[in-house]
A protein has these predicted regions:
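Juxtamembrane interface elements at the cytosolic ends of transmembrane helices
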Residues: 162, 216, 247-265, 297
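A donor-sugar binding/catalytic signature common to diverse glycosyltransferases
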Residues: 435-439
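Glycine-rich helix-loop "coupling/hinge" segments at transmembrane-helix boundaries
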Residues: 25, 106, 204-228, 312-316
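A short glycine-centered flexible hinge/capping loop motif at secondary-structure junctions
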Residues: 63, 169-171, 446-448
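Membrane-water interface segments at the C-terminal ends of transmembrane alpha-helices
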Residues: 1-27, 37, 41-156, 182-204, ...
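Flexible interhelical linker loops that connect adjacent transmembrane helices
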Residues: 255-288
Length: 466
């Protein structure tokens, strides 16, 4: 346990505390709030804070509007092609947002496909991808599945008898949804909205790709990379990002604590089978929503096969040379990506399983603190953790490298591991809860030590969850 504490403290807790300390201290090391006063005195930072808050809320609102119809249809109806619909609805999570931004520029940008058509037909253009609107559009199309997936689970867990009783008393249609269904599904909807908000304000690649820098995440990145690591304003911006994340977490928890959402008993979920014209209408609605959400994928697919695509509705020429370039002439891009992600995933599985085992199978003091530190990256924006790594490890030589840790590929693996650790901890915890302790006790009674019991009994049974 001490080893796990040391790892999590070194690579999660200490970098974040280091960022906080620099923002709250002066040149002599004394605590001060002068840096935050200077932050609010500067119009650039005030506008960046306001834009970040507004963009995060707008992404949540538009993601909710896109997700609710899809979630309700998926959770409440059975029809041909439902599995295909569910799969297509989660595809936006496959590509990073900044990749989607590149593709959307070719479809909705100033000289993109849609604006070329508008110019041809109506002699006008619409600035879909300009400024904050473009950032909100890209992030909405990428992050809405977080709300969708959580809302589907919440809708499926609602006791059908609650709605049946309301219908027997004359409550139907939208009134039924507003008075009964919506309040009961709020926990899942709020959880998805919270995750969407945090991911939206944390997103660095999309604003930079769209050349919109007046948000907190780009400002933190630019201050540290252009002015330097000694620029206090960059650390203050990072603390402002952390503050927004924590406030959103507390607000969601407070809101959900105002009411009771549990039911005493729950019947099996009831779905209605659609046939005939109703299936066509459902696919018409879902097809329109998913068609918009999959625009980045369509654009990136066309771009990958194009040789030239500029100021035309579609690529003028197509080629497989782009794939040949990546696969045969520059394969190190793919090799490095696979190597780093596989190493990070392997480390996450080891650390996540070990932490979950300590949480469930031990009574050691401090295990709850260990869980809190391991879960911290969910609330800490990635750019804040990256800035903390630069500050802490820039002058620290990694054993065997002979160079600072931040100048080697090792720091990427560590960052990926720590950033995604909460997911493997929670997955391991859930899987381990399904393994009865009597199975481990039986192995130990036959002479196996705890390590052998974990490797031979526990680990194979939780592999599916991992």
């Amino acid at each position: 346990m001490a080893f796990l504490f040391a790892i999590l403290t070194a690579f999660i807790l200490y970098p974040v505390l280091r960022v906080l300390w620099i923002a709250l201290s002066d040149e002599t090391g004394n605590l001060t709030l002068i840096h935050f006063l200077n932050f609010f005195r500067r119009p650039l930072f005030r506008e960046a804070l306001w834009n970040t808050l507004v963009s995060g809320l707008l992404v949540v609102v538009f993601s909710g509007l896109l997700s609710l119809p899809l979630a309700y249809i998926i959770a409440r109806y059975e029809f041909r092609g439902k599995l295909l619909l569910q799969t297509a609805a989660t595809l936006p999570l496959v590509i990073p947002p900044f990749v989607g931004a590149v593709a959307l520029q070719l479809i909705l940008g100033r000289s993109g496909m849609i604006n070329l058509l508008l110019m041809r037909w109506f002699d006008t253009t619409v600035p879909f991808m300009e400024g904050l609107a473009g950032v909100v559009l890209v992030q909405t199309l990428h992050f809405f599945p977080f709300i969708l997936l959580n809302t589907v689970v919440s809708l499926s867990n609602i006791d059908p008898s609650m709605e049946e009783m309301a219908q027997n008393m004359g409550c139907h249609g939208f009134r039924l949804f507003r008075r009964i269904t919506l309040p009961l599904m709020l926990p899942g909807f709020v959880a998805g909205s919270l995750l969407t908000f945090i991911r939206a304000i944390d997103d660095l690649g999309t604003p930079l790709m769209l050349n919109y820098k007046n948000l907190l995440a780009p400002q933190a990145y630019l201050r540290i990379t252009t002015v330097g690591m000694d620029d206090v304003d960059g650390y203050v911006v990072c603390v402002a990002l952390v503050f927004l994340s924590l406030v959103s977490l507390l607000a969601a928890r407070k809101y959900l604590g105002l009411a009771e959402y549990a039911t005493v008993q729950r019947s099996a979920p009831v779905t209605r089978r659609l046939q005939g014209n109703k299936v066509f209408l459902v696919w018409l609605l879902c097809g329109a929503l998913l068609g918009v959400s999959l625009l980045p994928h369509i654009g990136i697919l066309l771009l990958s096969f194009s040789k030239v695509w500029s100021f035309t509705l579609l690529p003028t020429t197509y080629t497989l040379g782009n794939f040949a370039e990546i696969l045969f002439r520059a394969p190190h891009f793919i090799k490095n990506t696979l190597l780093y992600t596989l190493l990070a995933a392997g480390l996450d599985i080891i650390l996540g399983a070990a932490i979950a085992f300590l949480l469930l199978r031990s009574r050691l003091a401090g295990r709850n603190l260990l869980d809190a530190i391991a879960t911290l990256p969910l609330a800490i924006p990635g750019v804040v953790l990256a800035v903390g790594y630069l500050r802490v490890f820039h002058g620290w030589d990694f054993p065997g490298l002979g160079a600072p840790l931040t100048s080697s590929w090792v720091i990427l693996v560590i960052a990926y591991t720590m950033r995604r650790l909460p997911y493997t901890v929670r997955a391991s915890y859930a899987a381990l809860q399904q393994v009865h302790i009597s199975l481990e006790e039986s192995a130990q009674s036959l002479g196996a030590n705890r390590l052998k019991t974990f490797v031979k009994i526990t680990l194979p049974m939780i592999t599916g969850g991992l």
